[in-house]
A protein has these predicted regions:
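Histidine- and acidic-residue-rich, metal-dependent catalytic cores
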Residues: 22, 78-112
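His-Asp-centered metal-binding catalytic motifs of divalent-metal-dependent phosphohydrolases/nucleases
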Residues: 39, 54-69, 78, 101-107
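Short, flexible active-site-proximal loops enriched in glycine and acidic residues
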Residues: 49-55, 72-74, 91-95
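An amphipathic alpha-helix signature
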Residues: 2, 6, 16-17, 40, ...
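Active-site metal-coordination segments of metallo-dependent hydrolases
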Residues: 25-35, 67-79, 93
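Divalent metal-dependent phosphate-bond-processing catalytic cores, especially two-metal-ion Mg2+/Mn2+ enzymes
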Residues: 1-7, 24-31, 41-50, 62, ...
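Short runs of predominantly hydrophobic/aromatic residues within well-ordered alpha helices
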Residues: 16, 36, 53-58, 99, ...
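Short, well-structured alpha-helical segments
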Residues: 13-20, 33, 57, 96-104
Length: 201
């Protein structure tokens, strides 16, 4: 993974290793280096669709840098970390602001028309939703494990509400060429998990 960081910013290994350490925190089960690697694979495969592919890659690295399951402001804190870190590394204010904006966007995945950077980042972050059923089940189980301290009668309706908000987005995927196929599979996965969550109460 550090090689992927070096391709974006050679000479700043300490920052890359700090980010990987954050993604490797013991309370994480889904928001791990594997999630970051999958996002980067999607971004790399469709880099030509973004206005600034490296800004999208940097946003992927920072978007879950702060992850506290009980905090409502993880994306904002991750964006602040990105701003501080990139400014210290000598990035321009404009590019630093763009990366921070993209990190904040992952809070709700609300992408404005014409925002190619935001569209690619959001598609990469949500790509897991379009995975095959077995992989999706693993993702759902990993998310549940991150919230192991939350009782079922609280977790289930809360998780179902989050999934319903995603399922009701006018566009789940916005820019990847396979978005129609991804959307169909993602909606099927989401509806299946929602039914399981609400039916098991």
């Amino acid at each position: 993974m550090i090689e992927a960081w070096r391709r974006i910013f050679p000479g700043a290994d300490a920052v890359g290793r700090d980010l990987l350490a954050r993604y490797s925190e013991p309370h994480r089960r889904y928001h791990t280096p594997a999630h970051l690697a999958r996002m980067l694979e999607v971004i790399d495969a469709h880099a030509e669709l973004a206005a600034d592919p490296d800004a999208v890659r940097l946003a992927a690295w920072f978007h879950d840098a702060v992850y506290d399951t009980f905090a409502p402001d993880n994306e904002e804190r991750s964006a602040s970390l990105a701003s501080t870190t990139l400014a210290a590394l000598g990035f321009s204010p404009e590019r630093t602001a763009e990366v921070a904006r993209l990190v904040r966007l992952t809070a709700g995945h609300n992408v404005e028309p014409g925002d190619r950077n935001g569209a690619l980042l959001a598609d990469a972050d949500l790509a897991i939703l379009a995975s095959e059923a077995a992989d999706y089940a693993g993702y759902a189980a990993a998310v549940r494990a991150e919230y192991a301290a939350v009782p079922d009668d609280v977790f289930r309706p809360g998780r179902a509400a989050i999934l319903r908000k995603l399922a009701d987005l006018p566009e789940l995927f916005r820019i990847v060429p396979a978005r129609a196929e991804w959307t169909a599979r993602a909606r099927a996965n989401l509806e299946s998990e929602i039914a399981s969550l609400l039916g098991a109460r």
